[in-house]
Swiss-Prot record:
One of its GO terms (molecular function) is metal ion binding. Signal peptide: none annotated. The gene is engB. This is Probable GTP-binding protein EngB. Keywords: Cell cycle, Cell division, GTP-binding, Magnesium, Metal-binding, Nucleotide-binding, Septation. Necessary for normal cell division and for the maintenance of normal septation. Mg(2+) binds at S37, T58. CDD domains: YihA_EngB.
Length: 195
């Protein structure tokens, strides 16, 4: 997939406040500070998604219109300890509404930090998406920070944990080196063309 143009067209802060569905869309979700905005910028090949050093900055669902016909959707990060219980409930309601009501959603890309074992919040997200029958692919981020001698071990560690929930594609990526970006774009292209 060649991304020719990208535009942030909607910032949704309340359930149902979404743009009309298009031909297809994919969404990206992960723990706060997992590198979601950096990965989106790498996919877009331009800096359009805001990257923050402060975890938990994305408190909305951001819809990026790609090539004037698809949405790439940036979901708010989860698992940030300094967020109040009320904010966590608002996040859950917003994301659950999105998952249940976007018929054009082809795939969710679950971003997981490749440097560390999957966290409890990642596994809860897997269970939640499975319970809602949401198709997802696991994307390991920050792989440039994993030593070459440890990569096979880290990949196997993630495969072993996630295999308890079923068979899932795992794509190692780095927004710094570009690793996995073309593979991810190819998968997205296939998904969107099938729609």
């Amino acid at each position: 997939m060649i991304i020719r143009d990208v535009e942030l067209v909607k910032v949704a802060r309340t359930p149902g406040d979404y743009p009309p569905p298009l031909k297809g869309e994919v969404a990206f979700v992960g723990r706060s500070n997992v590198g979601k905005s950096s990965l989106l910028n790498a996919l877009f090949n331009r800096k359009i998604a805001f990257v923050s050093k402060t975890p938990g900055k994305t408190r909305s669902i951001n819809f990026y219109l790609v090539n004037s016909k698809y949405y790439f959707v940036d979901l708010p990060g989860y698992g940030y300890a300094k967020v109040s219980k009320k904010e966590r409930m608002l996040w859950k309601r917003l994301v659950e509404d999105y998952f249940k009501n976007r018929w054009s959603l082809q795939m969710v890309f679950l971003l997981v930090d490749g440097r560390i074992p999957p966290q409890d919040s990642d596994l809860m997200m897997v269970e939640w998406m499975k319970s809602l029958n949401i198709p997802f692919t696991i994307v390991l981020t920050k792989m440039d920070k994993v030593k070459m001698s440890e990569r096979a071990k880290k990949l196997e560690e993630h495969r072993k944990v996630f295999s308890k929930y079923g068979e899932y594609t795992i794509i190692p990526t780095s927004s710094v080196t570009g690793e996995g970006i073309s593979e991810l774009l190819d998968l997205i292209s296939t998904l969107l063309k099938e729609n």
